[in-house]
Curated annotation (Swiss-Prot):
<keyword id="KW-0687">Ribonucleoprotein</keyword>
<dbReference type="Pfam" id="PF00831">
    <property type="entry name" value="Ribosomal_L29"/>
</dbReference>
<dbReference type="InterPro" id="IPR018254">
    <property type="entry name" value="Ribosomal_uL29_CS"/>
</dbReference>
<dbReference type="GO" id="GO:0003735">
    <property type="term" value="F:structural constituent of ribosome"/>
</dbReference>
<protein>
    <recommendedName>
        <fullName>Large ribosomal subunit protein uL29</fullName>
    </recommendedName>
</protein>
<dbReference type="InterPro" id="IPR050063">
    <property type="entry name" value="Ribosomal_protein_uL29"/>
</dbReference>
<keyword id="KW-0689">Ribosomal protein</keyword>
<dbReference type="InterPro" id="IPR001854">
    <property type="entry name" value="Ribosomal_uL29"/>
</dbReference>
<dbReference type="GO" id="GO:0006412">
    <property type="term" value="P:translation"/>
</dbReference>
<dbReference type="InterPro" id="IPR036049">
    <property type="entry name" value="Ribosomal_uL29_sf"/>
</dbReference>
<dbReference type="GO" id="GO:0022625">
    <property type="term" value="C:cytosolic large ribosomal subunit"/>
</dbReference>
<comment type="similarity">
    <text>Belongs to the universal ribosomal protein uL29 family.</text>
</comment>
Amino acid sequence: MKASDVRALTADQLKDELAKLKKEQFNLRFQKATGQLEKSSRINEVRKDIARVKTIARQKAAEVKA
């Protein structure tokens, strides 16, 4: 997911996206532990997507306060 795509989302959509990504991250960790994970690089992608969503949500919250 690109940062420009994330910036287009509203605050509620960001929360939903974050919840979805965290759920996916949990499932990927579970797959890794059981040896069923096919694309191990997806774990890093999801982790970075979570960071992007959190960063942009924080920036939007700061804009509202300013």
